[in-house]
Design a protein with these regions (language model features):
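A solvent-exposed interaction/effector surface
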Residues: 1-194
Length: 194
């Protein structure tokens, strides 16, 4: 009897992992071209993209949690007429003065004219210009300690390469909060001076 219970639980777990994997594979990932790669660090060229964004106050963790809801309601047409917009990855977050701006990149094929207007006055649509960025990729839980460690590694690498970061870092989250830390894809990115 115990053997059947264990086999049943193992089968259910495998099913959940496969379901999660299929869901992750169906999410459009933001496009970029790798210019230079060194282990977990890359210099990338990003094309112009359209984002839906919101600015929230509080800690990094509080801001991304409170900012996610209004952006999700926008793309899933919960507070507006029209079609749903597919979720993409990553969700990004950047410190701006004493607040945080959280962004959802719109799927390729959308431009500012084609996107429905947000009904929430705090949600903004904006086109970002092409940009060159340095990025470090890592897995793990979204903790400030881990982010500080990886941020320091990226800053040190840029200094050795003679690259000048512009502004504050962007935190990029590729997975939902239910994904185990060891399976997560996280990144820290800096825009680079020309």
């Amino acid at each position: 009897m115990l053997l059947y219970l264990v086999l049943g639980l193992a089968t259910a777990l495998i099913g959940l992992v496969l379901f999660w994997y299929v869901q992750v594979q169906n999410v459009e990932i933001g496009r970029y071209t790798v210019i230079e790669a060194d282990g977990d660090i890359e210099v990338r060229q990003y094309p112009a993209v359209v984002v839906a964004e919101i600015t929230q106050t509080g800690s990094r963790d509080q801001a991304v949690r409170s900012g996610f809801g209004p952006l999700a309601r926008y793309i899933f047409a919960k507070e507006r007429e029209g079609e749903k917009i597919a979720m993409t990855a990553p969700v990004t977050q950047k410190a701006v003065a004493s607040a945080w701006t959280i962004q959802f990149v719109m799927p390729s094929g959308y431009d500012l004219e084609r996107l429905p207007k947000p009904t929430d006055p705090h949600v903004r649509l904006r086109q970002l210009p092409p940009t060159r960025r340095a990025a470090i990729r890592f897995s793990g839980w979204w903790t400030d300690d881990l982010f500080r460690l990886k941020d320091a590694a990226l800053i040190g690498w840029m200094a050795k390469k003679g690259l000048t970061p512009v502004g504050t870092p962007t935190f990029a989250y590729y997975n939902d909060p239910f994904t185990p830390g060891f399976l997560r894809r996280n990144e820290i990115l800096y825009d680079l001076a020309p």
